[in-house]
Design a protein with these regions (language model features):
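Thiamine diphosphate
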Residues: 1-131, 136-137, 153-154, 173, ...
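Glycine-/acidic-rich phosphate or pyrophosphate-binding loops and their flanking alpha/beta elements
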Residues: 13-16, 248-272, 285
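Short helix-loop-beta junction
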Residues: 46-51, 249, 286-300, 349-350
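Conserved thiamine diphosphate
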Residues: 123-167, 171-174, 353-368
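Conformationally flexible catalytic loops at phosphate/diphosphate-handling active centers
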Residues: 167-263
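Redox- and metal-dependent alpha/beta enzyme cores, enriched for Fe-S-associated oxidoreductases
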Residues: 264-296, 309-316
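Peripheral docking tails and interdomain loops at the edges
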Residues: 328-400
Length: 400
C-alpha cells in the first residue's frame, strides 16, 4: 500500500526492514558475511544491487573481520558504508571493530543479537552486542521492525555529523525481530534524501591521492594519544544531545517520535517504573496499560541509546519514583546482575533523597519468551519494595 510522499506500508521481517533502511540511505559499499540470524539482511541487499535498485559495491569477504576491514578502507576514502552481523561474527571482527572506533569512522552496523557460546545456542539474546559496549561505538537498541528501519536512517545522520564522526550499532534481537514480521511504513526516497542531506555535506578527513595522508599511524605515548581519547569521549558526549535534535527532526518529517535517548511511557506520575531494552518492551507496555486500567500508578522507560549511557535523561525521568524494576536480557557476571541494572546504579546514587529502590530481573536468556506474567511479577515485586517489604535485589525469573 502506498501513502503520501511515496511512502509504502508493508509487512516485513526485521532483517528486511534493516535492508530497506540501507537501500534508502544509499551507501557506497556494503560488506556482509552470512551468520544466523542476520543472513537475510545481507541477502536482501545483494538482491537490491543485482536488481538495479541500489548503486553500491557489494563485496564477498571470507569472514567477518575482513567484512569490516573492507569498510574501514571504504570509509577512510569517504564512502558511506554498511555491514551487519551476529554473535560469533561480531566477536571475530573485534580487532577491526576497535580500529573503526579509534579512527572515528562513521560506519553503520546492524547487529541481529544472538547468545554467545558457550553453551552453544542459535537463539535470541543481547550478550553479543552488550560485550562490545565499551569499545567506543554508539549503540541503539530497537523494539520493533519499524524502529529498526527508522534507527538505521537516523544512524547515518548521527554518525556522519561533523561534530560526531563515530560508528553506530543498531541492535535488535535475532529471531524475535530479525525473522518476525510486522507492519512497517517505508519512507519515500525524496524524504530520506532531504533528511540525510546534512550528513552528506559534512566535512571529514579522507584518503585522497591529491592530498596524501596517513591514518592510524603509530602514536608515540604521551599527550597526542591522550588527545585522541579525549576527543573521542567529547564526541561521545555530544552525540546524546545531537541525537535528541535528530529524533525531533525525524519526527517532524516522518511523523514517528521515539523520544531520543530513552522513551518514557506513562511514567510522569508513576510511583513504580519498569526499565526495558529491546523487543520485550511491547509486552511490557501492554502490561503497564493493564495495570493502569486497574488503578496502579506504573510506567515504563525504554533504553534506546545504551552508549553513550543517557545519564541526564534517566536522572530526570526517575527522580521521585519509589521503586524501579529493571528487566535485563543479558548477564553482568561480576555483578551477579544484568548490565542495564548495573549501569543504572550510577544514576540512582545521584537522585533523592529518597533514592528509589532498584530491583533487577534477569529474563529471556537463551531465547526464552518474556511473557506478560513475568512483567506482572516485576511490577508486583517492585510495589512490594516500594511499600518497604523485604525483596531480593536480583531475581532470575525463569529459575525462581
Amino acid at each position: 500500500m502506498e501513502t503520501k510522499e511515496g511512502r509504502q506500508v508493508r509487512v516485513m521481517e526485521g532483517n528486511m526492514a534493516a535492508a530497506q533502511a540501507v537501500l534508502l540511505s544509499k551507501p557506497d559499499v556494503i560488506s556482509c558475511f552470512p551468520i544466523t540470524p542476520q543472513t537475510s539482511c545481507g541477502e536482501a541487499l545483494s538482491k537490491f544491487v543485482a536488481d538495479g535498485l541500489l548503486d553500491a559495491d557489494i563485496t564477498e569477504p571470507e569472514g567477518e573481520n575482513t567484512a569490516l576491514s573492507i569498510l574501514i578502507g571504504a570509509s577512510m576514502a569517504g564512502g558511506r558504508t554498511f555491514t551487519s552481523t551476529s554473535s560469533q561474527g561480531l566477536s571475530f571482527m573485534y580487532d577491526a571493530y576497535l580500529f573503526t572506533a579509534g579512527n572515528r569512522l562513521p560506519i553503520v552496523m546492524a547487529i541481529a543479537m544472538r547468545e554467545q557460546v558457550s553453551p552453544h545456542g542459535v537463539v535470541a539474546g543481547q550478550q553479543d552486542a552488550i560485550l562490545v559496549k565499551a569499545a567506543g561505538w554508539i549503540q541503539f537498541y530497537a523494539e520493533s521492525c519499524q524502529e529498526i528501519l527508522d534507527s538505521i536512517i537516523m544512524a547515518y545522520r548521527l554518525a556522519e555529523d561533523s561534530e560526531i564522526l563515530l560508528p553506530v550499532n543498531i541492535c535488535y534481537e535475532g529471531f524475535y525481530l530479525s525473522y518476525h514480521s510486522q507492519r512497517v511504513e517505508i519512507p519515500g526516497q525524496e524524504e530520506v534524501d532531504r533528511f540525510l542531506a546534512p550528513a552528506g555535506k559534512a566535512e571529514r578527513l579522507k584518503l585522497c591521492l591529491e592530498n596524501p595522508m596517513t591514518f592510524s599511524s603509530y602514536t608515540v605515548p604521551g599527550e597526542l594519544y591522550t588527545e585522541y581519547r579525549f576527543k573521542h569521549c567529547a564526541a561521545f558526549h555530544r552525540a546524546k544531545q545531537k541525537y535528541e535534535q535528530i529524533d525531533e527532526e525525524f519526527s517532524n518529517i516522518f511523523g514517528r517520535r521515539y523520544g531520543g535517548q530513552i522513551e518514557e511511557y506513562r511514567s510522569d506520575d508513576a510511583d513504580v517504573v519498569i526499565v526495558t531494552m529491546g523487543s520485550c518492551t511491547g509486552t511490557a507496555k501492554a502490561v503497564v496499560d493493564k495495570k493502569r486500567d486497574a488503578g496502579l500508578k506504573v510506567g515504563l522507560i525504554k533504553i534506546r541509546m545504551l552508549r553513550p549511557f543517557p545519564v541526564e535523561r534517566l536522572k530526570k525521568a526517575l527522580n521521585g519514583k519509589k521503586a524501579i524494576g529493571v528487566i535485563d536480557r543479558n548477564v553482568f557476571y561480576s555483578g551477579f546482575c544484568g548490565h542495564v541494572f548495573f549501569e543504572l546504579q550510577s544514576v540512582l546514587k545521584e537522585l533523592g533523597p529518597p533514592i528509589p529502590v532498584s530491583l533487577n530481573f534477569i529474563a529471556g536468556l537463551g531465547g526464552t519468551d518474556i511473557v506478560p506474567q513475568m512483567v506482572e511479577r516485576v511490577i508486583e515485586t517492585a510495589y512490594s519494595a516500594a511499600e518497604g517489604k523485604a525483596v531480593k535485589p536480583v531475581t532470575w525469573l525463569s529459575l525462581e
